[in-house]
């Protein structure tokens, strides 16, 4: 019996040894570089084939249809062979992916990317650099800091400014509200939230932002314990910018109630309209009432590098903090985003010294540990993508590309405005267009809501074009978001033709019979 147990143990040990040997053959290192190159060639073949044959931005598949493909996939049973795995990925992912580089992808703030940034992504992922501390990242630390400093020079926030890369605009806006909350609590009560938690009267803190600002401000308020009720939504003017009279009135009412103006969030490029709030005027109001001024330039930040449109961000230099998404108007892969603050001392709110990672002694010695200014610990080396793009493509060319899609938006506006059966409700400040199909029959708003929902879902189902949707004054609208330099006015004309085709098709049909089932079926599906 003892001998049998020994034999079993030896057998198990041998199996473990074989598995370990197999893992060694999969590790990225000099011994396996030839195998890695073979894998890269296989990936490139698949990419070339995919890009060459991709005609539409989307396959049109529904979630419940795609879900069926995953039935029977057993992740506990490896395929082992790279070619087999790539064929599976092609079927499960690439075949039904959404292609932002297609000229008729006009939906969300997703940009096609410069290929040089993909090369940088490959480098950063291959080395697997983590940038939270100097002893894990070396030169990567200084590349990120260089990108931060370069952006700060464009923002002109001053000598005490600093910043850090984040996962995206939502995290950057969360950091802004976190710093604003703690600054105000310390200012009015001498209270240190980091040590003591929130003061007893924290519900007096209020955040003022436009009704069309990004929803992440509400999310941040909830996460920070302030709640949605802490956010005061300020009406907008005819250009969908925060209305200054309404802002002043809202602040006055707040102060009369004994509340505290914690922060004012201005938007430089709203998601729907691309509208830019009057930053200089808002900065004056914020200064007068002692509020933290945050500028969400996740979308409009690309104006910083444009040859002819930098002036649209006048006043951003007055901000206490700024959000910029390079993965929008700088044509970088997701994610590539950063948060900036006028006074770097405020970043101490997110600093915690762990002896095993970033002890205080290292900071005192001048060691540049980036986790000292981030709410994240482990963090990817996203800055290399933009660094490499600046060194190979150049900031000016990236800026010209953004101006190109802005010009296209102006052309698109003129086209839509010339169509009698299309109602467009704003002129573009950046590269979005909000409009709706109205037909020629004087349909009610409720009917127009239904037809515009149908139009969007039909476009997606057929895969011919992808557009976005939004609501304005409780009415259903469609939206073009233009971020692709390859998109032409002809592409927009063709999409408008399809919009009108589906619109009239719906209006002419028996809504209760022929198209109601399809409409109801599609109603259950969200396309984002």
Model-based region annotation:
Residues 2-160, 461, 465, 476, ...:
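N-terminal entrance/gating region of PLP-dependent enzymes' catalytic architecture
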Residues 152-179, 232-234:
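Short loop-beta-helix segment that forms the pyridoxal 5′-phosphate
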Residues 314-419:
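Active-site C-terminal subdomain of aminotransferase-like
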Residues 472-528:
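PLP-dependent enzyme catalytic core of the Aspartate aminotransferase-like
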């Amino acid at each position: 019996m003892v001998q049998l147990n020994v034999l079993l143990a030896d057998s198990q040990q041998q199996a473990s040894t074989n598995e370990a040997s197999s893992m060694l053959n999969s590790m990225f290192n000099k011994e396996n570089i030839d195998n890695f190159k073979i894998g890269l060639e296989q990936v490139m073949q698949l990419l070339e084939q995919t890009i060459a044959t991709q005609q539409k931005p989307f396959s049109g598949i529904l979630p419940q249809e795609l879900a069926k493909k995953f039935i029977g996939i057993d992740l506990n049973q490896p395929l082992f062979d790279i070619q087999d795995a790539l064929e599976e990925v092609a079927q499960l992912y690439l075949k039904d992916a959404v292609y932002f580089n297609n000229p008729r992808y006009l939906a969300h703030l997703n940009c096609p990317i410069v290929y040089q940034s993909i090369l940088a992504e490959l480098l950063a992922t291959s080395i697997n650099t983590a940038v939270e501390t100097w002893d894990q990242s070396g030169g990567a630390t200084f590349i990120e800091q260089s990108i931060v400093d370069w952006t700060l020079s464009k923002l002109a926030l001053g000598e005490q400014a600093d910043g850090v890369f984040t996962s995206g605009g939502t995290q950057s806006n969360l950091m802004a509200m976190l710093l604003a909350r703690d600054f105000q609590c310390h200012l009015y009560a001498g209270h240190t939230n980091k040590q003591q938690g929130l003061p007893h009267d924290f519900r007096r803190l209020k955040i003022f932002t436009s009704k069309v600002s990004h929803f992440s401000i509400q999310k941040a308020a909830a996460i920070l314990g302030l709640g949605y009720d802490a956010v005061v939504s300020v009406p907008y003017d005819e250009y969908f910018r925060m209305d200054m009279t309404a802002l002043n009135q809202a602040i006055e009412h707040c102060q009369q109630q004994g509340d505290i103006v914690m922060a004012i969030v201005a938007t430089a490029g709203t998601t729907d309209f691309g509208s830019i709030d009057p930053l200089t005027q808002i900065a004056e109001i914020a200064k007068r009432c002692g509020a933290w001024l945050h500028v969400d330039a996740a979308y409009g930040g690309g104006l910083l590098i444009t040859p002819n449109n930098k002036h649209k961000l006048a006043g951003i230099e007055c901000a206490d903090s700024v959000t910029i998404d390079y993965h929008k108007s700088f044509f970088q892969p997701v994610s590539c985003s950063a948060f900036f603050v006028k006074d770097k001392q405020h970043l101490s709110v997110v600093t915690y010294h762990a002896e095993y990672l970033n002890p205080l002694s290292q900071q005192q010695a001048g060691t540049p540990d980036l986790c000292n200014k981030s709410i994240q610990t482990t963090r990817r080396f996203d800055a290399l993508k933009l660094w490499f793009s600046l060194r190979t493509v150049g900031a000016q060319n990236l800026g010209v590309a953004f101006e190109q899609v802005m010009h296209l938006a102006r052309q698109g506006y003129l086209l839509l405005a010339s169509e009698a059966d299309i109602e467009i409700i704003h002129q573009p400040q950046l590269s979005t267009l909000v409009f709706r199909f109205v037909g020629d029959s004087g349909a009610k708003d409720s009917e127009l809501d239904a037809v515009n929902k149908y139009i969007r879902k039909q476009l997606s189902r057929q895969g011919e074009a992808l557009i976005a949707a939004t609501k304005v004054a409780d009415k259903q609208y469609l939206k073009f978001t233009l971020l692709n330099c390859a998109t032409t006015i002809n592409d927009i004309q063709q999409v408008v033709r399809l919009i009108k085709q589906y619109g009239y098709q719906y209006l002419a049909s028996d809504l209760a019979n022929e198209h109601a089932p399809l409409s109801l079926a599609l109603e259950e599906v969200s396309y984002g």
